[in-house]
Swiss-Prot record:
Organism: Nicotiana tabacum
Protein name: Plastocyanin A'/A''
Coiled coil: none
Keywords: Chloroplast, Copper, Electron transport, Membrane, Metal-binding, Plastid, Thylakoid, Transport
UniProt binding sites for Cu cation: 37, 84, 87, 92
Membrane topology label: Peripheral membrane protein
GO molecular function: copper ion binding; electron transfer activity
GO CC term, one of those recorded: chloroplast thylakoid membrane
Annotated compartments: Plastid, Chloroplast thylakoid membrane
Function according to Swiss-Prot or TrEMBL: Participates in electron transfer between P700 and the cytochrome b6-f complex in photosystem I.
Domain of life: Eukaryota
Amino acid sequence: IEVLLGSDDGGLAFVPGNFSVSAGEKITFKNNAGFPHNVVFDEDEIPAGVDVSKISMSEEEYLNGPGETYSVTLSEKGTYTFYCAPHQGAGMVGKVTVN
């Protein structure tokens, strides 16, 4: 599945913002905006036992331009919450359920 960082109208959002994947399915986050975004998984809102450092970008790491991507594959079933560090306060938060 491809998830856009930034809506087509310039909104600070993940598109889609709430989605499901199968365990082992690749998720590709793609910057859809002219400014930096990233994908940080919330260590308190992922399944127990998952190492957040293995799935998350760091808060200081960015996809700086349109078309830049970050991919991750989640193998543990459950719900994962993620956010864009610079825009979390503006509501740029998403959720993925792994089945």
